[in-house]
Amino acid sequence: MPTEYFERRERALLGDRFDALYAAPQETAARGVTVSALRAAPEQFAAQADFPVEPSPFCKAGFVVQDPAFKPGRHPYHHAGVFYSQEPSASSAAPLLGVRPGMRVLDTCAAPGGKSSQLAAALGGQGLLVSNEFVAARAEVLRSNLERMGVPNAVVLNEDTGRIAAALPEFFDRVLVDAPCSGEGMFRKEAVAVTQHCEALVKQCAALGAQILDNAAACLAPGGEMIYSTCTFAPEEDEGQVAAFLQRHPEFTLADVFGNVDYSFGSPGEANRTGGLPLDVNKVRRIWPCQGGEGHFIARLVKAGTPRALPAPGTYTAEEELWLAAAAEQSKKQKGSKGGKPAKAPDARSARRESSRTLREAVQGRSARSRDAGAGEATPAQSLAAWQEFARQYFPALADRPAVVHGGSVLLPVPFPQTGLHVLRAGVFVGSVQKGRFVPEHHLFTAFGALCTNREALTLADPRVTEYLSGREIAADTAADGWCCVTVDGCPMGGGKVSGGRVKNHYPKALRLL
């Protein structure tokens, strides 16, 4: 056992069941991948994958990676957003939320993005996903991962959940709280989880989790549902946390954790872990190491009231139309820009945003110098006209979608109110005018590559896949001259520009295989 405190506590709670429950079936931490429905069906992935996997018991789209030496992050399907590399039991929580297209969904503690990518897949490109992360550097990783997964309808926030609750009360149909925890389910995966573990950390995490839960409850609309999950075994953070929350919030009821799905896994909660408070432990779920995952706890909570009626597929509510109109009006007020955001008086908050923007561009492989040289002096009207001309040629299905100019780049926005929250991304930046020409962004291809009329279609076995992901030019076979989307087995990896039978590589430098 990693720490004396952990073993003493768990032996006292479990008695003679201790050794059996903590006996993992494998020597190293379990590894898995979760397939995104935005890219492929699980059955299609299983048939086409060139590495050994077996279905995960925790999620219909999840698979256990059987080869301990396999590196998912270097696989072309990872780059194409087909799967997210995720510890198997970590994929269990998001599907239990019962997300449907058209809903407004909040992931309160979203980095690095595995559960958000599952929520995005359930939305199917319709509705709104707000993915929040409090730590700035982790929020940038979250943004990058959602772009890689091709999520078109996400707002990425770098905020405190209390500010979100104040700005967006009773706004969301579904909320996921995968709370920061003491990480006892990460002991085998991350050495730091062992070195940092102590009783004081458990108490600190329990207090933070309670605060986040209270804020999340304020964000949830009447009739909405919330999933609370952790990757720890500590009673104060699991059964005890949920029991205490229900005492503070009589407007919530504990629901069967499997009420939205047709499968089950794991074991019921433990009655001696509630801190003496009432809780139907049969409605919550634990995943023990002996069950094939590193460890997880999940509870499903429902808020009293009548759920919001969802808009018809492909439509917006009147309120959402107003938000889009407000974004367009704000765009018109911007002056011609050389890139970046409109200038304003420097203060602590703007400095924080500038620092965040610099890091974001580093992840995208764009420097401040190239940004300033790239966008030129195009006015918002000129930028929009250039985008519409580009879209009519390569993405005709997007040509009539609402578009705005933000910081010199053209954005396909998502309907989201102007709240003053720290937004890293709200929709899809599709490109900007550089030296008089429209140059597309990487996110345009990952989010909408299936709509591109000019594609260089590769198969997984094609050596050009590795060449493209390494940043090299490749021979053009199926794509005509001009901009194209480069795909692997029909899934977009990124963009390129064809000339003379060659595809000039536009895959971001920071993402390339080394």
Question: PLM features: residue spans?
Answer:
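Mobile active-site "lid"/loop adjacent to the S-adenosyl-L-methionine
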Residues: A137, R174-D214, I227, C231-E239, ...
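S-adenosyl-L-methionine
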Residues: N132-E170, V177
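Class I SAM-dependent transferase core
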Residues: F58-V99, L142, M493, K504-P508
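Conserved SAM-binding loop of SAM-dependent methyltransferases across substrates and taxa
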Residues: P112-G125
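Short beta-strand element of Class I
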Residues: Q126-V130
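Helix-to-beta-strand junctions that scaffold the AdoMet/dcAdoMet cofactor pocket
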Residues: L123-G124, L220-P222
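Conserved class I S-adenosyl-L-methionine
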Residues: G102-A111
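Polybasic, low-complexity RNA-engagement segments
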Residues: M1-Q48, A304-L514
